[in-house]
Amino acid sequence: MSWLRHKRWIVWSVLAVAGGLLLSGTAEANVLCRLLPMRCTYEGAAFRFTVVDAETRQPLGEVHALAEWQLMGMYSGHGGPLMALDAVSGPDGQITFPAWGPIPGPHLMLGSDPVVTLLKSGYKTLRLANPSPPGTTETTRVRRFGRDGQTIALEPFRGIPDEWVEQLDQVWAGLAMRNQDDNRKFRDPYLNRVRRVWAERDKVPERHRVRPGFFWFVEQEMKRLEGTPK
């Protein structure tokens, strides 16, 4: 068999497998984005967890959770969000996120598929990476949150105001690298987070509220998101 004929045979074999997987509609169809120059297709499974006080073990309401499914950026760094959702716990401390997808996109980051940040006034902020199930790769179609059904404890904050700013700085704008299109698509969850952080401004010294203090940047981002059309 000549090299040209062999090359054609390889291409037609790949296309035949691709066609079969696409017609099957199964999760295995994401194998194709490893073999061909095409985007993967992703879905996020629904999940829930309960937030409690780390000392009293009582459920915590009004905990803001921001979940981001982060794409792989350049040089294997973190990129923008494929999906971003937010939720607030009720009196029972339960936070629930719905399923989403299918959505096409580049490779998702393991551990950030999703990454969830938690914010509640008077408590230390918390970042929850996703302990991916065994066998999960960057191209696995259905992404499940490894902490589904768990109880998450938040520690009361008893530090000084400067330390509270440090806590807020870790979660105030989410973790994904956003562009203008991301701001348009996911305006509400990010704006909800920024507004909750902005509400904490009176608890810190004035130097954090004026330029170039932390809350000056928070205000600029809040105005930018408020002015972004959906």
Task: Give the positions of each predicted feature.
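Short, ordered, surface-exposed loop/turn motifs in non-cytosolic proteins
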Residues: E55-M74, L175-Q180
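N-terminal Sec-pathway targeting helices
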Residues: S2-L15
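Short consensus segments that form the blades of beta-propeller domains
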Residues: M38-C40, Y75-H78, G105-M109
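Extracellular beta-sheet/turn segments enriched in Thr/Pro/Gly and aliphatic residues
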Residues: N30-C40, P133-Q170
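A short, solvent-exposed loop/turn motif at the edges and junctions
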Residues: P104-G135
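Short, acidic Ser/Thr/Gly-rich low-complexity loop/linker segments typical of extracellular
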Residues: G73-W100
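Hydrophobic core
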Residues: V17-L22
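Beta-strand-rich domain onsets/edges
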Residues: G25-P59, L175, R184, D188, ...
